[in-house]
Amino acid sequence: MSQYLEATIDVYKDAALNPNVGLCCTTTPVWQLPELNIPSKMLAMNYGCGSTVAPRDLSHDPKILYVGIGGGMELLQFAYFSRKNGSVIGVDVVDEMIEACHANLKEAEDLNPWFSAEFIDIRKGSALDLPMDDETVDVAAQNCLFNIFKTEDLRKALKEMYRILKPHGRLVLSDPVSEDSIPDSIKNDDRLRALCLSGAIPLQDYIDLITSVGFGTVEIRAKRPYRILSPNQYPGLTENIYIESVEVCAIKDPMPEDGPCVFTGKAAIYFGNEETFDDHKGHLLMQNQPLAVCDKTAQNLANLNHPDIFISESTFHYDGGGCC
């Protein structure tokens, strides 16, 4: 095992034994749902940077996999929507985290009459070698884990997720990204990498890695401020590094011949005199009605130079629907 992965195990072993609220700064409020009560220790062990739980991914009784279980909060949230024995699988490589998560889930049983720990199947295993058969999962998720991996390990982890997902299955991810150049002295600090501070890569590089393993559709659902790394705190820096967190859904759709459909929140609006505009490529724009479009379609429409079509900038908050 690589030295940086061993350092990561040590960090999260300690985080399991001594919960650290500030270990990873979540940038989204914890869901408030009817009859969902989260144990205080589970909440303190929420080592994520966003959320991977979205109701629109969870219809039709999906089989769910969550990798890097932390204190179990997102396992509990997924179970809230499934409520069947073994419908949610959690995988973690840290024994102490697995033990702590089991204890938190038992406490969650006492706080939530609807919940049974039997809803969740926790397994020892690595994101780089998942203890799962091919094409057995509908929804897979990870929160603030994959950014820890160096490039080749990240590609391996993404391939593993792709392998275990059923066709059209969904991989939901939340990770830090940064458009700023992070010096090697910071990147190669194993502890900073384990703390989700030095492994952030540019968003486009992140998307390219996801699509390189075969995902044909990618949705950028949220993008928020996360951290500033300053020279005052990190002597290896000469200027501030701005880090954001993103929430992404990658769908195991077939890869289109002209490349993946990546939705970053762009929309096309036709405001001409006709009721509709048809680009004869499968996209029908209704008069004065915004249509969510992937970046590829947005560029193709922009290339038409049509005076009555407006293409919005990326919002990085895509919420469904659209051209593909």
PLM region spans:
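Conserved alpha-helix/loop element of class I SAM-dependent methyltransferases that forms part
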Residues: C25-K63, E74-F81
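Class I SAM-dependent methyltransferase SAM/SAH-binding core
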Residues: H60-D129
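A short acidic, Gly/Pro-enriched loop at the edge of an enzyme's catalytic core
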Residues: L128-A140
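A short SAM/SAH-binding and catalytic strip from SAM-dependent methyltransferases
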Residues: D138-E152
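A short glycine-rich, Lys/Arg-flanked "PGG" loop and its adjoining helix->strand segment in the class I
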Residues: R155-R170
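Short, glycine-/aromatic-enriched active-site segment of Class I SAM-dependent methyltransferases
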Residues: P176-L197
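Short alpha-helix
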Residues: S198-G214, I220
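C-terminal lobe and adjacent flexible extensions of AdoMet/dcAdoMet transferase-like proteins
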Residues: V213, E219-P225, L229-C324
